[in-house]
Amino acid sequence: MEPLIALVGVTLALRIAGAAGVRRLRSWPVALRGGLATMFVLTGLAHFIGLRAELISMVPPALPNPGLLVTITGLLELAGAVGLLLPPTAPWAAGGLTALLVGLFPANVYAALNGITTSPEDALVPRTLMQLVFLAATVAVLASSVRGRRPRWRSAVAPASAQG
């Protein structure tokens, strides 16, 4: 639940700061990037401190070297968080984090179905709903970045009202 609270709380705080006059935070995509970055810093750090043992136990047994996998995914989450804060890399970070969320979801399913985690929000349905919110946020950042970079072509032909 903490990642969801971080995502929503920081996104709203940044958007409120934008409404209060901080120009760089006036758009929802920028505020959402900040909320996602905060969330992924928290979850990325959890791969190294606090929840490391639990995260290692969530890795399905078919995958090799769970400790290394948890380390790699933690580093990817931290790198993605930094990437979200830099406008040139934000689309790449959002795309990578989207793929990471999809790729890591089977570990959440495995943990929920095998009783590895005991908190209610880690049960399959709540966890799936949270994962969908996280995915929606990363896809929204990616979509806004792609939309903002699309060239705006002007017609080479003058409009009919200008001809004559």
Task: Spell out what each predicted region is.
Residues 1-164:
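Membrane-interface extramembranous regions
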